[in-house]
């Protein structure tokens, strides 16, 4: 029987060409890119080449591309930076947001007195755009909206 994978919102199979390149790099260019020895410099060149390639695809500067270890670290960096650097005072989200976001939002509320507004979701796991507009209109401070576009646990698409 042929298997079919339907959970691509959670994790997606790596393309064969990407996997081949990753294996080659991990076998032959495994130096710490922060080190000054030859292996480290070689790894740094590979990383910076990848950064430039991605930046070109998105028409941004390479310095705007940040590599992280995964989704949780990415969520934490964005949320913490929004509060500390951009002076966001209100975050609008939902109770079904990814736990990494919800945990950081809770932390920001407790430690930085950020106001959190939770939008209601319907029985399909979607928000009302009217509710979002009302929440935005009720805020007199800098605001960040964080909403999961595709929920891999319940299958909703917002």
Regions found by a protein language model. Name each.
Residues 1-158:
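Pyridoxal 5′-phosphate
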């Amino acid at each position: 029987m042929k298997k079919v994978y339907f959970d691509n919102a959670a994790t997606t199979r790596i393309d064969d060409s990407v996997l081949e390149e990753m294996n080659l790099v991990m076998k032959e260019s495994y130096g710490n890119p922060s080190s000054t020895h030859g292996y480290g410099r070689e790894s740094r060149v590979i990383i910076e080449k990848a950064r430039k390639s991605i930046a070109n695809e998105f028409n941004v500067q390479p310095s705007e591309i940040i590599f992280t270890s995964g989704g949780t670290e990415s969520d934490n960096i964005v949320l913490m930076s929004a509060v500390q650097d951009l002076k966001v005072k209100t975050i609008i989200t939902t109770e079904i947001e990814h736990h990494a976001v919800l945990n950081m939002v809770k932390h920001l509320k407790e430690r930085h007195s950020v106001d959190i507004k939770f939008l209601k979701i319907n029985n399909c796991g979607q928000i009302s755009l009217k509710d979002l507009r009302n929440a935005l209109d009720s805020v007199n401070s800098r605001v960040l909206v964080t909403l999961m576009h595709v929920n891999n646990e319940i299958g909703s698409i917002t």
